[in-house]
Amino acid sequence: MNATQAMIDLDDTEGLLAADRDGLLRAASTAGAQVRAVAAALDEGALDAVRGDDRPRTVIWVGGRGTAETAGAMLAATMGSRAAAPIVVAAEAPSWIGPLDVLILAGDDPDDPALVGAAASGVRRGARVVVAAPYDGPLREATAGRAAVLAPRLPVPDEFGLCRYLAAGLAALQSVDPKLGVDLAALADGLDAEALRNSAGREVFTNPAKALVERMSRRRVVLAGDCAATLALARHGSSILLRIAHQVAAATGLADALVALRAAADSGSVDPVEALFHDEEIDGPVAERLRVLALALDAEHSVVASRVAQLDDVDLVGAEDVPEGPGVSSAPVGAQRAEQQLAILAVRLEMAAVYLRLVRG
């Protein structure tokens, strides 16, 4: 930051909007619209080709780089135990793929060799293929009209495309296994409510995304998950903070984060008393303390809370942890499914990354 730049206050609505020259807040707020676009395509019959009386042997998710890969990990973690067929996340189409399998291709690049190669293999071996990517170029040629297509309908940067991939995967799973009871409309409503809670006009004490920025301020940040789903979410948050806010944040399992936190406390790396009397002009910059944001689903909330109860530098973050205040909508406790909670937390982390970038000017 140079002398002409200044920090923007999180409650300065006009300053935040003026600093958002790239439209990042708007892009981060489109998750609900992206899900509705997928639901509309589903209603229009986009996935009729993959429906069938027989359940698939395996559902295979081949994701490109970034958010598509993360979405596959989240779907496998949350839906794997409920789906009639096992969900496999792979970098390419497996050699055993055949007519009994469903192949979902997800990404933002129709020229991606991994997606194109997987598409060609899936079509050649008779698998039911779903394309959740721009349907153009080599990817279109590889499928030759023999795939169900859920191409993106809204132009959104890949950083904010996680919820679209989640919705596409849920739609495909629902098509081959109607007993799952996937509700894309409820997911979209929840994401719209989250975006509204995190809007620039809401003050920090009623805004979950801004509150996260406050917690991360002047700290070394670790995003931690205690299961496969929240660990995938932590990695997404780490990636988004780096790509959007240029903020380095580690992503790891909760057990590793707690070990590091206790080790830092035992070493006395930051003495609270010394920090109180620290003079940066004489003593130099004070060392930043570690802040662990423990991401938790509702089902594991009480267990994770008990593990971190005695630690001051750990904050528990759940989808339903919404500050109370006038005009702030909150989700009914325990009413959201795991995939909905993950999507809500993903939007919260994405908007926090945007605010972190904007306040730095």
At which residue positions do the language-model features occur?
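Short hydrophobic beta-strand segments
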Residues: 58-63, 220-226, 291-295
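Glycine-rich phosphate-binding loops that contact phosphosugars or nucleotide phosphates
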Residues: 54-196, 297
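Short, charged N-terminal beta->alpha structural module
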Residues: 25, 58-80, 229-238, 299-309
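Flexible, charged surface loops at secondary-structure boundaries
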Residues: 51-56, 96-100, 123-124, 214-218, ...
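Short helix-loop-beta junction
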Residues: 74-88, 239-250, 310-314
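Phosphate-moiety recognition in structured ligand-binding domains
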Residues: 1-40, 127-129, 133-148, 164, ...
